Amino acid sequence: IDPLTILKILKGGLKSICKHRKYLDKACASIGQ
């Protein structure tokens, strides 16, 4: 497998994780209360 392809996939994964971070933070906050 091409290392560049792996990097692209990792970057894409990080972007989607960051996108979901907002929702995760809200969920964690509501659970913590």
From Swiss-Prot:
Keywords: Disulfide bond, Secreted, Toxin
Biological-process GO terms, alphabetical: cytolysis in another organism; defense response to insect; venom-mediated perturbation of biological process
This protein's GO CC annotations: extracellular region
Keyword Disulfide bond: yes
Keyword Disulfide bond attached: yes
GO molecular function term, any single one: toxin activity
Subcellular compartments: Secreted
Tissue: Expressed by the venom gland.
Function per UniProt: This heterodimer has insecticidal and cytotoxic properties. Induces immediate paralysis when injected into blowflies (Lucilia cuprina), and then death within 24 hours. Also inhibits the growth of Aedes albopictus mosquito C6/36 cells.
Subunit record text: Heterodimer composed of subunit A and subunit B (DELTA-PSDTX-Pp1a); disulfide-linked.
Any further remark recorded for this protein: Electrospray ionization experiments give a mass of 6598.6 Da for DELTA-pseudomyrmecitoxin-Pp1a heterodimer (subunits A+B).
Name of this protein: DELTA-pseudomyrmecitoxin-Pp1a subunit B
